Amino acid sequence: MGVSDRYMVKWFLGSDANGIYAVAYKIPTILTILAAVFLDAWQLSAIAESDGDRQAHLRFFGRIWDAFASAVFLGAGGIIALSPLLIRLLAEEAYYDAWRYIPVLTLSMAAAAFSNFLGSVYVVTKRSAASFWTSLSGAGTNIVLNLWLIPRMGIQEAAVATFASCLVVFLIRLVNARQLLPFPLSGRKLAIGVTALLVQTLFLLFRWPGWVLAQLAGLAVLLLLGLPALLSTLRVILYRKQANV
């Protein structure tokens, strides 16, 4: 989706706008890369665990999802909060305005990471066709929204189109993948995490009064929300390692 975004930004808005968008896109991609490294290793474990007791497998899947989602939320919240500073440190001064597009693109990368985790369900259940058509639905949404929004509203709308398309894929997979493998997933935690990221994004972009406090509050909520799952999963991993020694 990122390739089509940049192509259309360049087509409609010119090379300068495309350069700013490309710089903004690079920082949230850190989240995607780290998630991809984890998911490559996770899929092997998910396949191996699928040969055992189904209920134990579902609990294992749910536990890993909880920890993964917590880590993604915390990573995304940190990138959003620090986006003006990150651009100042990592990009030339001419590209400083690129920070304005990082928060929405970070939301996109978080949604993409969640979609990729749910894609591991298709690997375990050998439903690769479902992975293809859900990805295709997101690509189609992205192209349509880019064609509609970018000429009218500019660079930020390319980021919005990317977020919307990643969200479409995630929501479709959330329903479809959990029909195939109904692992435990807390809708309440998911809603709280998404709300915290949206609050951070809106306060930062519009510089509403208390925007700094909103970043700190959002990160605190995400930490309180995710820390128990992260610590619990870490204990399980350490226990398994000790048991295998």
Model-derived segments and their meaning:
Residues 5-7, 19-35, 65-67, 108, ...:
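Alpha-helical transmembrane segments of polytopic membrane transporters and translocases
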Residues 13-26, 98-103, 159:
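Small-residue hotspots at the loop-to-helix junctions and early N-terminal turns
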Residues 16, 129, 136-171, 175, ...:
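Membrane-interface helix-loop junctions in multi-pass transport and translocation proteins
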Residues 28-65, 119-124:
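Helix-loop junctions and terminal segments of transmembrane helices
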Residues 35-38, 61-112, 143-151:
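Alpha-helical transmembrane segments of multi-pass membrane transport and lipid-handling proteins
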Residues 106-137, 177-179:
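Membrane-interface junctions at transmembrane-helix termini in multi-pass inner-membrane proteins
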Residues 202-245:
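Membrane-proximal transmembrane or re-entrant/amphipathic helices at the cytosolic face
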